[in-house]
A protein has these predicted regions:
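Structured adenosyl-cofactor binding patch, chiefly the S-adenosyl-L-methionine
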Residues: 102, 140-144, 155-170, 228-269
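Active-site/ligand-binding-proximal alpha/beta "capping" segment
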Residues: 196-245, 250
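RNA substrate-binding interface of SAM-dependent RNA methyltransferases
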Residues: 38, 45, 72, 81-86, ...
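Glycine- and other small-residue-rich loops at beta-strand/loop junctions that grip anionic moieties
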Residues: 6, 32, 126-127, 152-153, ...
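Glycine/charged-rich beta-loop-alpha catalytic/anionic-binding loops adjacent to active sites
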Residues: 23-24, 115-123, 233-243
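N-terminal positively charged helical leader segments and presequences
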Residues: 1-93
């Protein structure tokens, strides 16, 4: 069967594709866009089947692995659509695209679908606004073997193109979910998972907390930190010691510090 070829940037399918840049459309359709060879490859490796894979041979000249990825997607049952350069650049989200773009099921699941393994390490992000921070936390979670990331009262969604891009595609390899703050804490409480909240308002340093066993590490929004509700419902509070003039760290940095302390403690046991 011959692949569909689209050369006109005004093609209706491309216009429809562009609507997936809007969160509401992603939520209504359950579809998102993943762009780039690395990100799309990781999605496929994680078992995500693209509905459609768009590729531009002209832009893939410097990406030899691109052709192999197209064939992998074809073998997995994805529709393959070839785009001319102008058409591809119309729908590409990033500058200097490499000629690979896929329409995939949006990442994320409901908490009801999640089974935590024994000794699970959970990262709980409440009210995080910037997609880049969520992406950075995903990369940390992937590297550290985090079992689940929960976005509580998220300002953005897991299918945001900037989340996918900044995560380098790890949004597909790390289990992710979204819920309200109450729902997230209720679910963790029902599972018997203690929540360790990060806040400057405590004397307990993160290295002195017991982060072995099943535990959730909670971080809050970039501007306000964790809400009073989240702090009140958490089991423990810890702070990261700081000796400089700045009174706070980037939320993704804070998450990485505490998550890797949990990893260190588990290896020491």
């Amino acid at each position: 069967m011959t692949d569909l070829v689209i050369t006109s940037p005004a093609n209706q399918r491309l216009k429809d594709l562009l609507t997936l840049r809007r969160r509401r459309v992603r939520e209504d359709t359950g579809q998102s866009l993943v762009e780039g060879l690395e990100e799309t490859s990781l999605a496929l490796e994680a078992g995500v089947l693209p509905q459609t894979l768009f590729h531009c041979p002209e832009l893939m000249l410097d990406v030899p692995a691109g052709a192999a990825l197209v064939e992998r997607a074809r073998a997995a049952g994805a529709e393959i659509v070839e785009l001319g350069r102008t058409a591809f650049e119309k729908v590409a989200y990033r500058e200097g695209p490499d000629g690979i773009l896929a329409k995939v099921p949006s990442p994320g699941r409901s908490l009801a679908e999640v089974d935590l393994p024994e000794g699970a390490l959970v990262l709980l992000c409440e009210g995080v606004e910037k997609p880049g921070n969520l992406g950075a936390m995903l990369r940390t979670a992937d590297a550290a073997g985090v079992s689940l990331i929960i976005a509580a009262d998220p300002v953005t969604d897991w299918g945001n193109p900037n989340v996918i891009r900044s995560s380098k595609g790890t949004v597909f390899s790390v289990p992710v979910a979204a819920a309200s703050t109450d729902q997230a804490w209720d679910w963790l409480a029902a599972k018997g998972v203690p929540v360790v909240a990060t806040t400057p308002e405590t004397d307990v340093v993160h290295t002195d907390a017991d982060l072995t066993g099943t535990v959730a590490v909670a971080v809050g929004s970039e501007k306000y930190g964790l809400t009073e509700l989240a702090l009140a419902r958490s089991t423990h509070r810890v702070r990261i010691p700081m000796v400089g003039r700045a009174n706070s760290l980037n939320v993704a940095t804070s998450a990485a510090i505490v998550v890797y302390e949990a990893v260190r403690q588990r290896r020491a046991d």
